[in-house]
Amino acid sequence: MPETIQEVIQGMPGQFNADAAKGMNAVYQYDITGDGGAQFYTEIKDGAIAVKEGTNPSPNITITMNAKDYIDLVNGKLNGQMAFMSGKLKIKGDMSLAMKLQSLFRPVA
């Protein structure tokens, strides 16, 4: 299980579910705050993913979250809907892409 944001970023391509992304064309911006935070984005295009550090000028969705909470989310210790409802997870942009996010990545084992 990843313990740092860098480990999450490095593991994303391996956790990616290409079948769930067929026909998709979207950019997810991640603004991870606090200790160990980072800014990175994923470009998803028809079943392929590219993970890049930094910011994208025109993402379809921006996800903002504290680094510790994001790692808990990735590791299955924090429910995404509960995180959103409690304000730990902030979403700006296309909400339907947020709903699809869970199917795009296999659970971390």
Predicted regions and their residues:
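Feature captures hydrophobic
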Residues: 1-109
